[in-house]
Amino acid sequence: MEHEQDDPGTSTNVGVDSSVDDSMASLSICDSEHPNIYRQDIVKNKKTGSVGVVSEVAGDSDSDSDISDEEEDDDDDEDNDDDDEDVEEGKKASEENVVNGDGEKKADGNYKCGALEGDQIRVLWMDNTEPVQDINDVTVIDRGFLHGDYVASASEPTGQVGVVVDVNISVDLLAPDGSIHKDISTKNLKRVRDFAVGDYVVHGPWLGRIDDVLDNVTVLFDDGSMCKVLRVEPLRLKPIPKNNLEEDANFPYYPGQRVKASSSSVFKNSRWLSGLWKPNRLEGTVTKVTAGSIFVYWIASAGFGPDSSVSPPEEQNPSNLTLLSCFTHANWQVGDWCLLPSLNQSATIPLHKHVSKLRLYDSQADRQQKIGRDLEDVQDEVSGKVEPAGITAEALPKVTSDDPPQRNPSVSKEPVHEPWPLHRKKIRKLVIRKDKKVKKKEESFEQALLVVNSRTRVDVSWQDGTIECRREAITLIPIETPGDHEFVSEQYVVEKTSDDGDNTTEPRRAGVVKNVNAKDRTASVRWLNPLRRAEEPREFEKEEIVSVYELEGHPDYDYCYGDVVVRLSPIAVALPASSPGNSFEEATQQDNGYQDSESHQEAKILVDKEENEPSTDLSKLSWVGNITGLKDGDIEVTWADGTISTVGPHAVYVVGRDDDDESVAGESETSDAASWETLNDDDRGAPEIPEEDLGRSSSIEGNSDADIYAENDSGRNGALALPLAAIEFVTRLASGIFSRARKSVDSSSSDYTVENVYKQAESTNPSDETDSLDDPSPSKVNVTDNCESKGTQANAKNILSGETSTFLEDEDKPVPSEGDSCSFRRFDISQDPLDHHFLGVDGQKTKERQWFKKVDQDWKILQNNLPDGIFVRAYEDRMDLLRAVIVGAFGTPYQDGLFFFDFHLPSDYPSVPPSAYYHSGGWRLNPNLYEEGKVCLSLLNTWTGRGNEVWDPKSSSILQVLVSLQGLVLNSKPYFNEAGYDKQVGTAEGEKNSLGYNENTFLLNCKTMMYLMRKPPKDFEELIKDHFRKRGYYILKACDAYMKGYLIGSLTKDASVIDERSSANSTSVGFKLMLAKIAPKLFSALSEVGADCNEFQHLQQQ
């Protein structure tokens, strides 16, 4: 899990191991042969009792140990090159930290080389080492979770999942004197610095997320001198010794930490609070850490007036920012440094006895230099009381050498010139007075404490609708990638579109999940009555049990515990207090018993003011907050001003999610009309915005409802259209602007190893280019060369060479698919690709001779070497276009399906790979094949890869692409195609998700079949009809087998069951419910094309 606050450790951890409560071991879940251990787990060594944090688990490619270690080393080297002293320091550090007693490398960054074996983990121990450990040699004593995390029971990892709704952590703290403070709630802890990277902050009407923080560090030297290093760079002011846990970029410094400057210039340019700079003074103790400068990524604005239309500067003074700190207590972990205000600790650092600044000087020059600097200190001290411009040595008070220091000096009315010893005494009095004041203030400071142990308990909302409170975190495991159909209680959902895919305007019901049966994959949903306007009270229809495969997450109402939200409508209809419209909201506000009472004791639960009366005052910070409760379709929000209120789903909007790259109204003019304004990175902090943007909000009121929603409201009913209605409702009543930044995130996909799949394609011999047809026929290939957009046709034989010609077999020699009596050619030339996706691409541009030769070669390879189950059509008048269909292989959830792809060969082909488009019909049935037609494959350079996984202009071909799609994409377990999911292979979570993915994939495969029979792509009408006529019987036979519970993808080519015993009852009830709805439609469609369906009449009556 992501941990925002991994503070650096210290070497002052003597006796830490003995401080760990041995009873914690009894709570461990590590009793099995291969315990569940995850990155960031807190573990205890069974032999030594040491406590540490897991930094890497075998197979965890996203572990911290993989993060740019080389880049960090490069940064260190650059810094060292700038300073010889730092170079020497680095050499000493490398010599001291080569190997520890166990033969393991010290934690200096060089240990992170070499992959871990299957039963190994890497642990950061409190004794400054990070050795590789056997997974069975440690015991998990704590596990961290955040609000909104998905979890499962460690004893039943394939059972129901839950969502963390509250976190309570108690910690043991190591004090500087070696004492241990046990069982301290993290709610009582204070950060060593108020702001951290990743925090959300508010500045006026703007909400932002902190990207970077530069510290102001106050350093106390051993001789009592003190300075403040402004906007310090961690590479120039380094901890001594090196941190015992991973370096934390968020909190590199803490009070009580020893630091050393990389060069004397670090302190020379600092602000001196006491004493003077000396070039040989490089080490000191940190007494205070504050944020000096904060860099903020501005996300959203919800306000009125000019301040809300232009984002503030990226760099901000901390005093201008308000921290949104609802859940900071959940971010503590072993190794963090903290302050404990309730302890009232005042630790005094033993210092060397002060050396008088007024010692006798060896020369008059030294004396004058010293006097001048001391006078600067004096001037700072008295600047608020005396005119600073007139302060000179002569203007200081008259005091005899026998006078004791006192605080009632008088200023001489006229200059008096006196001998040096008396002059010296005058200066001494003020300087000593100042030193005493600073010493009294700074010598005693609150030192940080180290978190050496933690115990986490969480409240979990389970899929079955129950809420379990204060469960021990080590009895749960994190679910990092919940399946697409792992819905949870109180989640908003909508019905999927109809099976035929034709009626895009068909209303879809929206509802709230009350509970989910994880085993059966069914959900109990309370459907919402359609609403015409957002301000109407929500009413529920009947509660219905449906298959989870019939549902998908609500596209607009996607809320989770812990989400940061802003109020969409700070003003609403001003309803009378007695209006029935208020009773619904007030009733929901009174029923909050499911929340943690402790965390809400000091907060005042209010009836949402903005729900009842207009208001434009954002100074109370009641427009931004965190979701702390979900119940009966309503959302409880703890606002930044500390108040709590319950709002409807239309009233707030989630911000800050990484995948949040579209406005609520979509990428259409609707978005602009609703006064959602995209904030591009290039515009960030700009002093002005274009006039057309400024004029958007003023034109909103003139837009009618029809104008606003006409373009982008298909497929929505009243319940689904609530967010659009809410925005329109807001803009009718106010001219405010809700702006937010857009962050583009590429869709993730999977990488493929194509080495084995390519063997067949690479073995193709293209040396038959000189073969030609004896009988020139109209089907011979014509190519376009040096033509305008309309193009003139020329025979390929004349263009390429007299030796090279087209390579189609004689039409009297068709090559049908093996095992089928269908006469449909595997490769053929067609005319007029009218429905081709790339038809609009200009294919008549001038092409080089090499292009034609490569296309000629590719066509010949396809004509001679296409494997079973792949059919291709080229086009006589558009040689740059191809269309292919792949038949789904048996033993996969794609069995007997047809999958169509369009290809375009650009003018610089083969230097670049072809472009591809998948005819999805609107369904996502593979991680690499997107609804919008994107094909994600390393061979097409749409995903990363190495070696022969990527396109090679010299050896790659269209055939390789097709074989990759057939064998690597449309495989038996497509779930693991998703990027990073390969590490889940063999795990309970992975196999559970894979089974569910296969069930949904087969259902989508059936829908795709019906779609293709209704709308066959051009030039493949004959193939589609003949394929489903011949395979229809086996398709229905597979449906019948799966309805009986046999495992998806376990059937032979003739849809027979391989093992009658092992596969029974493998499919879920939810899958059977959904298939029972699809089967009758599929039966009818197959009957219409002439398939033999009589044996499966019972499917039509499901």
Curated annotation (Swiss-Prot):
InterPro entries: UBQ-conjugat_E2_core, UBQ-conjugating_enzyme/RWD. The keyword ATP-binding applies. Keywords: ATP-binding, Nucleotide-binding, Transferase, Ubl conjugation pathway. It is an enzyme of class 2 (transferase). The active site is at C936 (glycyl thioester intermediate). Belongs to the ubiquitin-conjugating enzyme family. This is Probable ubiquitin-conjugating enzyme E2 23. It comes from Arabidopsis thaliana (Mouse-ear cress). The gene is UBC23.
